[in-house]
UniProtKB/Swiss-Prot annotation:
A GO term from the CC aspect: cytosol
Underlying gene: ligA
Entry-linked SUPFAM superfamilies: BRCT domain, DNA ligase/mRNA capping enzyme, catalytic domain, Nucleic acid-binding proteins, RuvA domain 2-like
SMART domains in the record: BRCT (SM00292), HhH1 (SM00278), LIGANc (SM00532)
Task of the protein: DNA ligase that catalyzes the formation of phosphodiester linkages between 5'-phosphoryl and 3'-hydroxyl groups in double-stranded DNA using NAD as a coenzyme and as the energy source for the reaction. It is essential for DNA replication and repair of damaged DNA.
Gene Ontology molecular-function annotations: DNA binding; DNA ligase (NAD+) activity; metal ion binding
Cofactor: Mg(2+); Mn(2+)
Protein name stated in the entry: DNA ligase
Amino acid sequence: MSAIQLQIANLVNELNQHNIKYYVDDAPSVTDAYYDKLMQQLLALEAEHPELIQSDSPSRRVGGHALDKFSQVTHLKPMLSLDNAFEQADFEAFNKRITDKVGTVDYVCEPKLDGLAVSITYRNGQFERAATRGDGTVGEDITENVRTIKSIPMGLRGDGYPELVEVRGEVFMPKAAFDALNARQQAKGDKTFVNPRNAAAGSLRQLDSKITASRALGFYAYALGVVEGEVQPMEPSHFGQLAQLKRWGLPVSQEVKLCDSLEKVYAYYDDILNRRGQLSYEIDGVVIKVNAIPKQLSLGFVAKAPRWAIAYKFPAQEEMTLLESVDFQVGRTGAVTPVARLQAVFVGGVTVSNATLHNADEIARLGVKIGDTVIIRRAGDVIPQIVAIVPEKRPQDAQNIVFPTHCPVCQSLVERLEGEAVARCSGGLFCEAQRKEAIKHFASRKALNIDGMGDKIVEQLIDKELVQSPADLFGLTASMMTMLERMAMKSATKLVAAIDAAKTTTLARFIYSLGIREVGEATAANLANHFKSLAAVREAGVEQLLEVADVGEIVAKHIRHFFDQAHNLEVVDKLLAAGINWPEITAVAEDELRLKGQTWVLTGTLTQLNRNEAKAQLQALGAKVAGSISKNTDCLVAGEAAGSKLAKAQELGVKVIDETELLVFLGLAG
C-alpha cells in the first residue's frame, strides 16, 4: 500500500469512527471543526487520486449522478406491515392471543417512528444496497440516496458479523431539520412540506442524490431481516439483536425498553406519550414485539403482518370544523359512499377537507346534517373521519343528508341487501365509475401488473370509449393509444407491449384481478392452490368454497354470486380468448404427495421457472418450502449464484440439485 493509500485509508477509518461515535454512541469525540478539517483533507486527496476512493468513504455521502428512474428490488424476505391497536382492549386481546399460544412473554417496546421503512443489505460487512418497503415484496432501489445518510455506516464495526446481513429500519426527518428545510423552501418561493414524514419521503425518493444529501435525514435500525453465513450464533432475543446491531455500528433508538409485565408496557406507553412533544422526531405510537425469537417463530405470520408484534397507536388528534356539503362516490364494487366536504382544517399534521361518512347507518348514528359543526379525527393519524357533532352549534337551516336512490354516475338503481350496511349501484360494468375502478384494479401491480397502465390512462381509455371492460385492453393497438393525451407512438408501442406481456400471469393473480368482493391476494392464492384451475373455481358451490382456507360464508357467497352473473362470465371468457394464460397447477391425490413431510429450500437465480412458480410446484407435491438451510432440510435447489446456502447445504450433507434436475423431477423438462 502506498503512502497516499495509507493516508486515505486512515482518514476514512477515523472519519467513520467519529460518525459512529456521534450518531450511534451519542458520544462525540471531536469538535465539528476538527471533523470538517479531516473531511477537507480527505476530499483534497481523493480529488487528486480518484482511483483510490474507497467504497466506504464518507465523501460518497454528498451524492452522485442523477438517475433516470428507480429500479425495482425484490426483497429477500417480505417486509410486512404491523397490525394496529388503538385502545388498551386491543392490546389486551393481542396479548391474550400470544399467551394462549406460547405462554408468558417479555415484550420489547420502542417508539413507532413516523417515517419510511427501508431495508439495508451489508455483504461481508460492507454496505451493498438499500430499498424501500414498496408493497412488501418489491421495493425501489434507493442505494445512492441512503448512502448520503450520515448515521448509516458504510461498513460494519468490529467482527463476527455474517456474510450477508439485512437490516430493517426507519428513515425519518428530525423536527429541527424539517423546520430548517421548510424555511429554505419558503425563502426560495418553493412549495413547503406538510409534515416531516412527507419531507422524508420526498427527500428519499429524489432521483438526484445530491438533493437527498442536502437534507438532514436520520435513521434508526429496528430489526434484522435475512441473515446468511453466520460466523457466530445470532442473539436469541429481539432486544439482544438490537444490541448486536448497535455493536456493529448501526444507530438504534435510545428509547427501546425491555418490559417483563403488562404494567411496564402500559407505563412505557404513557411515558412516551407524555414526552412525545419533547422528542427530536415525530412518532405516532409504540411498537410492541415479543422478545424471544423462538416464540416469534412459533407464533408466525398472517398474510400481511407478524402475529408477534403490534403497533399501539396514540390517540388520534381531533379538531372541529364545518360540514359544508356531502357528495356520493361509487367504488369498484359499486359501493356508494357518502363523502363529507369540510371547511379545511389542520389535523394531525395535514390539512383535511374531506372525510368519509361510510354509509347510511353511520349518518343516522351520528345524527349529522349539512351545516353542522363536526369533530374530525385522523384515525390512526391517517384516515380522517367524523366522530361526533357539536349539537349546540347546529344552525336553524341545517339540512338532512338524503341518500340517493339512483347511482350518481349511471342512474341505475341503488340497492342495499338485507344484512349489509353498504348500498351499491346495480349497474355493474354499465356504470362508468365501476368500469374505471375495475380496470384500474385489473391492471394494478398485484393483479395483472401492466407496466405503465396508470389511473389517468385508464380514465382516458374509458372516457374516449376505447375500453368498456378489462378484456378490451387486449384489443388495443398503438395507433389507438396515440389518441390519448401526451401519448406518442413510441410510448404507445411500449404500453401495448406491456399489455401483451401481462397475458402470462398466475391463476392466483388472475382471480385477484377480477375484483371479486372480499377476495384479496391471500384468498385468491388459497382458491388457486385449492382448486388448481379456473374452471373448478367457477363451478364450485358455496359448500365447496367453504373448504378453502380463510373463506367464510360471506366470502363464499360473493364468489358464487360473481360467477353466477352472465356479464362477469362473458368478461372472463373474453379474457381467456385474448390469450391470458398461466402455468398449470397439477392436482395431486393425497396418496401421490411424494414430497409430503419433506422440507425443500430454493436459492440463487432460476432461469426457466421463477421462484414463485417453483415454490408452487413443490408445495403442490406436499413439500414445505423453507427460507433457510438446516439439518432438517431434505433438498436444496441451487440456481445461478447460489451463495452461502449452497455452502451450508454441502457442509451439512443436504442433497443439492440444480434447476435442470428440478425440471426433470417435476416433469417439466424439454
